[in-house]
């Protein structure tokens, strides 16, 4: 006699049992004749975890190991991501294209029942925090590299290939990248575009997927977590727009236009919220190729943008959108009032403007300062100024120029620093580190040490190597040094990490880029 048996639903928590996994088994309709046929239950024995952490652009692959309690039967697979069917393949292949947390489930079934395995995939940013680096090939082709600082303190390595092209496959990276800042959730990049030919037309660079043939000067907004371009601003309306410095604070404000310094000393203004380039309203003259953008990381309205006015021969500061005001013992001196008597730096030329970096602890108690190097004939002078020039003097009941006691001699004779020299200064060791050919030298700016007698802190590469950029760690204990070998082809750029105090080489990352042009430490 034929008897129809309905097997009960068995619900079990997913726990390891006897070397395998027990799951949830659905009810089965059994139309066989007596005696009852034994079921072949599915066990997930391994090859799959409850939690995965991967980085964007990585591919997760999962191939579970299965067993069946009785005679093996044909099984089918269903992979779900956020309650949507993703695949029916035996192996789960998941290219991580978006950041976030994704709830997933594996369903394996045969004719006797089903087994479920839920799991979570966290897709993290491979660009969360670390070194971002722009470099150029000899033909001008741009490249963006990144080295992640792992949260667990594990080993570090640079990405392979151009991060811009990887994350923006439909865009060409404009040639001759030159500067980069992190501001209000974005990495803002500046590229000078293709070199002009003798006829004035854009001169193409060698063809490659990222060469940007014939590209105009371009400003890019990249999402700081994904490096995906959120705004691309090609600039074709101004013939002399060849950017060299993005003078933009770390926090932008709506409605504020920030300066972009160009190769010929002119300045254009750029709205970070509107992505528009315009003629300047604040900096309308010619300026030296050394400047400073300083802010406290707070509100976007609190910043100092410091330039050297070449015609007036004086520093000027756009303070939180006001000014620019010129450096003088006279408070809030405007340009029309600058003369030999009011100009603090009268009869001097600029050598270098360097912000003096502070640790988080120092920022709570110390003034924000900058080191100013100027020259007059064979005499180089140093001045330590407040980034805002003036500080309130309670005893006088008024604002006074804060110049740390005034100007003093840095060196007599040949000056070994110029506007283009890579420099970093810190308050921890009261030292200025600067690149000099294939060396990093250290000058104790708070002492009477002559600048031309600065110590050699470390030497890099061959005798022909050139140091192009320096970046301090947040605690000042280490310094990142970017350099390249001009006689080498291909990836001829390297980054080393040294002790800021002793110069000892702590980490080496050889041949990770082309000629480095800009390096920053990208914060979370």
Predicted feature residues:
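Acidic, serine/threonine- and glycine-rich low-complexity intrinsically disordered segments
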Residues: 197, 205-436
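Conserved blade-ending motifs and adjacent loop-strand segments that build the rim/top face
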Residues: 403-419, 451-475, 504-517
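Short loop/turn segments that connect beta-strands within beta-propeller blades
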Residues: 150-151, 224-225, 273-274, 395, ...
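C-terminal motif of bacterial Sec signal peptides marking the signal peptidase cleavage site
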Residues: 23-26
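Bacterial N-terminal signal peptides that target proteins for export
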Residues: 2-13
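Acidic/polar, low-complexity intrinsically disordered N-terminal segments immediately downstream
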Residues: 4, 28-167, 190, 474-476, ...
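Short glycine/acidic-enriched loop and turn motifs that connect beta-strands
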Residues: 137-141, 194-198, 266, 312-314, ...
């Amino acid at each position: 006699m034929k008897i129809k048996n309905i097997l009960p639903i068995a619900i079990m928590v997913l726990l390891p049992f006897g070397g395998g996994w027990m799951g949830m088994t659905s009810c089965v309709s059994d139309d066989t004749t007596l005696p009852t046929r034994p079921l072949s239950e599915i066990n997930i024995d391994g090859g799959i975890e409850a939690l995965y952490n991967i980085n964007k652009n990585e591919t997760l692959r999962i191939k579970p190991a299965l067993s069946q309690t009785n005679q093996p039967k044909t099984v089918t697979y269903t992979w779900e991501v956020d309650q949507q069917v993703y695949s029916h393949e035996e192996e789960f292949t998941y290219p991580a294209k978006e950041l976030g947390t994704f709830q997933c489930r594996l369903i394996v079934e045969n004719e006797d029942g089903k087994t479920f395995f839920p799991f979570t995939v966290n897709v993290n940013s491979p660009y969360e925090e670390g070194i971002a680096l722009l470099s150029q090939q000899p033909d001008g082709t741009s490249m963006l590299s990144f080295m992640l600082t792992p949260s667990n303190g594990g080993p570090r390595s640079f990405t392979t290939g151009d991060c811009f092209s990887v994350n923006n496959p439909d865009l060409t990276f404009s040639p001759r990248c030159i500067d980069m800042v992190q501001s209000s959730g974005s990495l803002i990049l500046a590229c000078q575009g293709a070199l002009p030919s003798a006829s004035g037309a854009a001169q193409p660079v060698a063809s490659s997927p990222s060469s940007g043939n014939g590209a105009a000067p371009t400003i890019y907004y990249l999402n700081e977590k994904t490096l995906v371009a959120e705004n691309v601003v090609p600039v074709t309306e101004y013939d002399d727009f060849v950017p060299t410095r993005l003078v933009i604070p770390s926090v932008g404000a709506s409605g504020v236009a920030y300066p972009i310094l160009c190769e010929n000393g002119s300045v254009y203004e750029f709205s970070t919220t509107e992505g528009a380039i315009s003629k300047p309203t604040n900096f309308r003259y010619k300026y030296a190729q050394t400047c400073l953008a300083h802010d406290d990381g707070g509100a976007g309205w609190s910043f100092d943008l410091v330039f050297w006015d070449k015609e007036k021969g004086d520093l000027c500061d756009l303070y939180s959108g006001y000014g620019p005001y010129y450096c003088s013992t006279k408070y809030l001196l405007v340009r029309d009032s600058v003369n030999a008597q009011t100009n603090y730096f009268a009869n001097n030329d600029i050598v270098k403007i360097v912000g003096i970096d502070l640790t988080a602890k120092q920022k709570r108690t110390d003034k924000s300062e900058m080191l100013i190097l100027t020259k007059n004939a064979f005499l180089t002078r140093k001045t330590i100024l407040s980034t805002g020039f003036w500080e309130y003097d309670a005893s006088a009941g008024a604002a006074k120029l804060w110049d740390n006691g005034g100007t003093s001699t840095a060196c007599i004779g040949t000056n070994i620093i110029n506007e283009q020299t890579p420099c970093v200064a810190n308050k921890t060791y009261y030292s200025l580190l600067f690149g000099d050919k294939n060396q990093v030298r250290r000058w104790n700016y708070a002492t009477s040490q002559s600048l031309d007698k600065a110590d050699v802190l470390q030497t890099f590469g061959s005798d022909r190597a050139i140091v192009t950029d320096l970046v301090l760690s947040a605690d000042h204990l280490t310094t990142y040094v970017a350099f390249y070998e001009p006689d080498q082809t291909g990836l001829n750029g390297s980054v080393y990490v040294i002790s800021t105090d002793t110069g000892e080489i702590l980490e080496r990352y050889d041949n990770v880029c082309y000629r480095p042009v800009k390096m920053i430490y990208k914060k979370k």
